[in-house]
A protein has these predicted regions:
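Low-complexity, acidic Ser/Thr/Pro/Gly-rich terminal tails and inter-domain linkers that flank the onset
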Residues: 16-48
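Short glycine/serine/proline-enriched coil/turn segments at secondary-structure junctions
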Residues: 43-44, 64-65, 112-116
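Asparagine-centered strand-capping/turn motif at beta-strand->loop junctions
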Residues: 58-62
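Short acidic, flexible loop segments centered on an aromatic residue
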Residues: 64-83, 124
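Intrinsically disordered, low-complexity Pro/Gly/Ser/Thr-rich segments with frequent PxxP/GP/PP motifs
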Residues: 84-115
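Terminal connector regions
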Residues: 110-148
Length: 148
């Protein structure tokens, strides 16, 4: 899922956005929202392998266009093992996000434990130079039986 679209529709209830994306952080008018989801069909607890997808929405509430140049993730599993991942852009793209627009993407992460956390930052550039945008820390947990 990749899209760039206007995100401030008239009358849109911001509380709804908080329900869809339970994790959010804002840096210099750029809001990063994250919604993780456990994927039981791709997981095998006996392996052990637990897989989550995470939907990220990056909203540009500022007055200038920004380009996402790189990402840095810190992934910590339930045993406290940390992995740092850095690279250019996201999902093979370095999107330009115009003022009042948003960029969405979905990616995934496997862990050997049934819980963990992720956080990090995106490096952005704009007319006023480069800056880092926080990715909110979010929790990865296997839901109770019957949940997703």
């Amino acid at each position: 899922m990749i899209s760039t679209r206007h995100w401030s529709a008239p009358g849109f209830d911001t509380m709804v956005m908080g329900l869809i994306f339970p994790y959010a952080a804002t840096t210099r008018d750029i809001t990063v929202r994250v919604a993780p989801r456990y994927l039981p069909d791709q997981s095998d607890p006996d392996a052990p392998r637990h897989v989550w997808s995470y939907h990220v929405r990056i909203e540009n509430g500022g007055s200038e266009a920004v380009q996402l140049r790189s990402r840095r993730w810190l992934i910590t599993d339930g045993a406290g093992r940390c992995e740092s991942i850095e690279g250019p852009g996201v999902i093979g793209q370095q999107p330009v996000i115009e003022p009042g627009m948003a960029f969405d993407y979905v990616s995934g992460v496997p862990l050997a434990t049934p819980s963990g956390t992720m956080d990090g930052a995106y490096h952005m550039t704009g007319a006023s130079g480069g800056f880092d945008v926080d990715i909110p820390a979010f929790v990865l947990t296997v839901p109770a039986a019957g949940g997703h």
